[in-house]
């Protein structure tokens, strides 16, 4: 990979990993509501699911041109529906002022999010088909970059969770408003799948 292409790869992957999306918003919300330590199950579920999805993207990238457009469209609708459900859960979750301490979303729920998270699927397919496959089709490179993509994504999730933890007091003071804003951002993510 040339230095120019490598620079573009890092720019694309880091910006994509750090911008708002279902994972980052969920990480922020969980750490704000429950603290960083309580959110490690959520982060672990995201990370494992992210890795598996990136490996699946590696396989899909080889044959992307022949994928049935109806299947891709169906995946988009499933992803949007799950993201809207997640937005509803965040918008209606109790805040500290409500006097209730809801449990964070489970490992398996955050794991399952990855398989309908169109942002990370597109992230993986785009990075692999744009930066890796034109340079090499060696399986070791494709798998290695897939693992790297998952690590970069996990880094973004942890950064957002740490922000939620560090600003927890402020976020808890304005918990209801924060939950509404995060839910609206998730709705925006769902709409952006189609437009």
UniProtKB/Swiss-Prot annotation:
The cellular component terms of Gene Ontology attached to this UniProt record, alphabetical and capped at eight, are: plasma membrane
Pfam families linked? LysE
Catalytic reaction(s) noted: O-acetyl-L-serine(in) = O-acetyl-L-serine(out); L-cysteine(in) = L-cysteine(out)
Q: How does it sit in the membrane?
A: Multi-pass membrane protein
Q: What molecular functions are annotated in GO for this chain?
A: amino acid transmembrane transporter activity
Which family does the record assign? Belongs to the Rht family.
Q: Give the protein's recorded name.
A: Cysteine/O-acetylserine efflux protein
Organism per entry: Escherichia coli O139:H28 (strain E24377A / ETEC)
Please state the gene responsible for encoding this protein: eamB
